[in-house]
Amino acid sequence: MDIQQYMQRLGEQARQASRAMARASSSDKDKALAAIAGALRSHRNAILQANQQDLDAGRNNGLDAALLDRLELTPDRFDGMVEGLEQIIGLADPIGVITDLAYRPSGIQVGKMRVPLGVIGIIYESRPNVTVDAAALCLKSGNAAILRGGSEAINANQAIAECIREGLREAGLPDTAVQVVETTDRAAVGELISHPEFVDVIVPRGGKGLIERISNDARVPVIKHLDGNCHTYIDGQANIAKAISVAYNAKTQRYGTCNTTETLLVANAIAPQVLPELAGKYQQAGVELRGCDKARRLLTEAGITGMVEASNSDWEEEFLAPVLAVKIVDGINDAIEHINRYSSGHTEAIITENYTLARRFLTEVDSSSVMVNASTRFADGFEYGLGAEIGISTDKIHARGPVGLEGLTSQKWVVLGDGHIRL
């Protein structure tokens, strides 16, 4: 297979399909999504068998347990995948909505219309459910998509792709509106990110190495986040019970997600009241604590052992594991300075009962999501009311934070007149 010619053909077909999707009605798009859901259910056994092939190959190739877990489509995960698709049907269609329409002194009306981006390339690893999520969000937002999943999920992705094509045909939409790259050759990724004439934006989902490579090499705009080094700061005026509950959940509710807290900052004024109890809870859950000198000394005096010395690199690390960096800070100035220096710009939280300090934290912390008295684990498109999300962006232009339907669109200016001429 000539990869360059193959990817160019996918790009040409996607560009042509994107024009049909841009003019597709909401009912046609919803009909396609419903038909895809029906096809997935009809081919459930075949998809699960294909996934089992991927799992068997993964074990033979030495994939670790975490990757195998992300790769696996259990019956419950399959049902959740289809239900998530059906929830997208119920979301409001953003396309064609005109906002900010106003008369100008000349008599013309000026506003903004929500429009699709065009062709979206999505590059991801392991999880076959991303194939369904990404296809559904792109279709609902009037875009065409080229999906390049990980080689470890090739069989399940191809089985799912056939269901997507079936649903599109049933709705009278081009079955090239969603195309799954059917080669495992890594050169396909290089081609996908190198053709702005066919692809309008790339969304990479995966490990830091993949996203760095895409960001460095792409000739197409990229919506991305490199990692999720999230912080929770317990202020000196925090409610202790609330602080312990939120900080514990932010770390232990799930370890391998990008919105899990990786660094805990505690104000010096409240550290003796909150840190020993919280450290004990973390250790009971099997969390390794890496602390600054003050934190280690405080816990030793409280009779709690096991906290190891934090290195400088720990402050900027996304552990994705039961490991937590802990630092005692002088107060909110120190906390904000630390966060803005080491954070990846994903999600940060403050626990405090002081409204003024909470507002200051919201204003001065430079991340895509900033929270007050809530777990960082809430940084999620579903929790924000976006429905499903295509990913999370820590960039400051276009989409920022969880990227849902609206993040896959743009706006164009519309001008309405009645024979108006400029004098």
Swiss-Prot record:
InterPro entries: Ald_DH/histidinol_DH, Ald_DH_C, Ald_DH_N, Aldehyde_DH_dom, G-glutamylP_reductase_CS, Glu-5-SA_DH, GPR_dom. Its EC number is 1.2.1.41. PROSITE patterns: PROA (PS01223). One of its GO terms (biological process) is L-proline biosynthetic process. It is found in: Cytoplasm. Keywords: Amino-acid biosynthesis, Cytoplasm, NADP, Oxidoreductase, Proline biosynthesis. Pathway: Amino-acid biosynthesis; L-proline biosynthesis; L-glutamate 5-semialdehyde from L-glutamate: step 2/2. One of its GO terms (cellular component) is cytoplasm. Its main location: cytoplasm. One of its GO terms (molecular function) is NADP binding. Pfam families: Aldedh. It catalyses: L-glutamate 5-semialdehyde + phosphate + NADP(+) = L-glutamyl 5-phosphate + NADPH + H(+). It comes from the Bacteria. PANTHER family: DELTA-1-PYRROLINE-5-CARBOXYLATE SYNTHASE (PTHR11063:SF8), GLUTAMATE SEMIALDEHYDE DEHYDROGENASE (PTHR11063). Belongs to the gamma-glutamyl phosphate reductase family. Catalyzes the NADPH-dependent reduction of L-glutamate 5-phosphate into L-glutamate 5-semialdehyde and phosphate. The product spontaneously undergoes cyclization to form 1-pyrroline-5-carboxylate. HAMAP family: ProA (MF_00412). This is Gamma-glutamyl phosphate reductase. The gene is proA.
